[in-house]
Amino acid sequence: MPKLWDAVAGFAVTFGTLFKKPITEEYPEKPGPVAPRYHGRHQLNRYPDGLEKCIGCELCAWACPADAIYVEGDDNTADERYSPGERYGRVYQINYLRCIGCGLCIEACPTRALTMTNDYEMADDNRADLIWGKDKLLAPLQDGMLAPPHPMAPGATDDDYYLGRIGPATEDVR
């Protein structure tokens, strides 16, 4: 008889919770709110005219304790200018299989080229797709931006870019 009573008590719990509001998240259909200071996916930023902020200094790669960042710098030329300084990051990769999300790379970046977004959906079923290159990391072009390579704003120096004195690309640059 005690075993029957245990089964009835178990069903009482089951039936009691059957009509309550579910407490589980419906994640894929309705993503939950993200805290404003959440650090998720990395992003390589651009200046307002579209030039890249990354100067290829590799400080982010040196600061990474998990060795998840690979950077190859290259020199800008008069014909091909990707950033306002002498150098730019020709190859930039982040291996999200190794990244621990610590943010030390963000702190090490002297030009604020690398930041972290609120995007947290980076799952994939293929390991090779979790090594993100520059094409996935670069911020999308906004209105007034030109895709590099293009010359710097007329009369501007690299200091003008670093100090925020440059606005969107003008007709002179286009």
UniProtKB/Swiss-Prot annotation:
- Which intervals hold domain 4Fe-4S ferredoxin-type? 44-74, 90-119
Q: Which SUPFAM superfamilies match?
A: 4Fe-4S ferredoxins
Listed cofactors:
[4Fe-4S] cluster
User: What is the free-text note on the cofactor?
Assistant: Binds 2 [4Fe-4S] clusters per subunit.
What does the subunit comment say?
NDH-1 is composed of 14 different subunits. Subunits NuoA, H, J, K, L, M, N constitute the membrane sector of the complex.
Q: Which family does it belong to?
A: Belongs to the complex I 23 kDa subunit family.
Q: What is this protein called in UniProt?
A: NADH-quinone oxidoreductase subunit I
